[in-house]
Amino acid sequence: MKILVDISPEHYDRILSEFSEESPMYAILKNGLVIHHFEASNEFRTVEILCDKFHARMILAAAEMYCPQAVAEIEEAIRLSRTLH
């Protein structure tokens, strides 16, 4: 089952900065896509990371250590477990 983890670019950058380029976690995070949303002439950006549940839990553990503000966003994605076909 694939999970779509959707977090703010600031939280994403904070978590990513804790890992070296050789780290498996770095590779998982780098698979994220920056998505631009437009609402009432305002632009909002999010980073979407499509991964399996195991990797989503790894991202959650990293957020708990390095960016507690991102935990709720990631927990919600895991809870919803949106599947893509």
Short names for language-model regions:
Residues 2-28:
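N-terminal acidic leader/helix
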Residues 14-15, 47-48, 82-84:
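Short, solvent-exposed polar/charged micro-motifs at secondary-structure junctions
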Residues 1-2, 79-85:
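Short intrinsically disordered terminal tails
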Residues 19-71:
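Acidic, low-complexity, intrinsically disordered interaction modules
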Residues 11-12, 70, 74-82:
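Long, compositionally biased, charged low-complexity segments
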